[in-house]
Amino acid sequence: MNPYEAERKNFPPQPETTFSDSLSAFKMAFFLRQPSMTAQIGIDLGTTNSLIAQFINGETRLIPNRLGHFLTPSVVSIGDDGKILVGLAARERLRTAPQSTASAFKRFMGTDKTFKLGNKTFRAEELSALLLRSLKEDAEAFLGEAVDEAVITVPAYFNAIQRQATRNAAQMAGLNVLRLLNEPTAAGLAYGLQEKPDDTRFLIYDLGGGTFDVSVLDYFDGVVQVSASAGDNHLGGEDFVQILRQCFLRQCKELSDAERAKLSDSSELWQALETAKRKLGEEMQAEIAVNVGGRIVSAVITRNEFYEAAKPLLTRLRQPLERALRDARLHPDQIDSIILVGGATRMPLIRQTIAQLFRRIANVSVNPDEAIARGAAVQAALIARDESVDEVVLTDVMPFSLGIETSTDLGNGERAYGIFSPIIERNMPVPVSREERYSTASDNQTEIELRVLQGESVAAKDNLELGRLTVKIPPRPEGEVYIDVRFSYDINGLLDVDVRNSEFDISANQTFRHNSVNLSEEEIQASLKKLAALKIHPRDQHENIYLLEKGKRLYEEHLGDQRQIIGHRIMIFERILESQDHAQIRRAQSEFAEFLSHYDGGWLL
């Protein structure tokens, strides 16, 4: 039976209801420690640096590491004696022993990428576990008591697998995760309690070392309410360093290919580039000099050259901003304050760009490096019902849409398969429960296989599969058997899928715990790496590719009925391209372009 043979019917959605449940995390065998009722902390598990904080006596305080610093570099190394080094010591070895040191591994959480440190191999979550264990030990040494529970922050745009990988890392480190808190939400919580703004709508601009998130929040009567979130998990301060690397190598024409290849992994060059990036924030130019085979190779990079080369990154930063504002149905002028979070927001280039986009100076009352950890500590105190914390209610939203794979009728007896049908759309407040109705797509079906998906693409194959649920149905003519599919999602990431049809006594239920537990690791990674492939024939022509990509972008940007209409028109245009009828394709191009123009307002930012 074709797994796609369910068709969405345009019945009105059922009223939303709340859904709440808890998830007991599975036990891990690494770094064994027994959990106990002890101090709760907040952890900002960052790409470049990590921090710990605790809420005590009515305020948040940062917890120093073993060297007395609040910022712990997110770097892990194996020393010459075979022992694990974490933090500042490990960061020093990026230059002296790069073959035994790993950094920026947060970017690869939930993937199958491995890091070779000496003769040992680690996954990103294993390296994160080593980092978390070090942070846990620092907290225990400072507080003088066991620490077994923590609120850990993650990028708002982390998907289910990345979130589960973070939980796994915590379990390996001997930490029970009280909650995974979205980073911009944590920053908003810290800002709300510190500033106590009255009826304020603010935007959190969170640019860290490796990830970028933006969230729109409202603060009123002690409530911090997230209206919309968007982001890019592969965009951060590290990418601006890479831009400088390209500028440097472009000037150093005397370098051989072998020398360039060696420099690509040079920690000495990375440190020189990082220094130059900061210097360009204060001066008009910076010199970058490194030792290559016993000789000094140098180049001078001007601020204008750097800013010009960084324009593509600024464009990428702009896209999540537009999506968050669009989903919140707000114009930039309706934002009362912009809060900067993350060390990369210290770059003057970023602050100037924000000032130009919003026509105002961003708020820096909360330390960009500390806000997320402080917010996590507040959340830990709220969970522990600490009486010293001000009464505050926090609501968050879905970062991604959840739905199933279906087919759709294109008319004239044609049907398109592999279509994503959202049930819970992104940026809906959680906990949430919604229901949609689907019917059979062919005669005498005996079962419907529901592929549960997370993502925004109109093509089901381009979204992340969380699992499958097979529903037995009586054989009947096409469309006579329907099923009501209810998705219920809670704040802990627990998804309950319930299928019902009282007329035919159909019922099925399955709970998906954070990620696709029914899939192998190989299948999970394959689903993450799938990309849309344009077919040959007219599809490879520039105009057609442009229109299809524009349609996909607009589908991802819109919600509800508009999203369904756009998705349907994409399917029709693709079907016309496959016909290879050039006259029909030319007419369709004009009509499709005009159709898309109605949904591409272009007024935002």
Each language-model region and where it sits:
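Cationic, low-complexity basic patches in intrinsically disordered or flexible, solvent-exposed regions
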Residues: 8, 15, 35
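Short N-terminal leader segment in a subset of presequences, especially plant chloroplast
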Residues: 9-11, 46
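Aromatic (phenylalanine/tyrosine) cluster motif
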Residues: 4, 11, 19, 24-26, ...
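Oxyanion-binding/catalytic loops of NTP- or PPi-dependent enzymes
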Residues: 26-111, 115-121, 130, 137-605
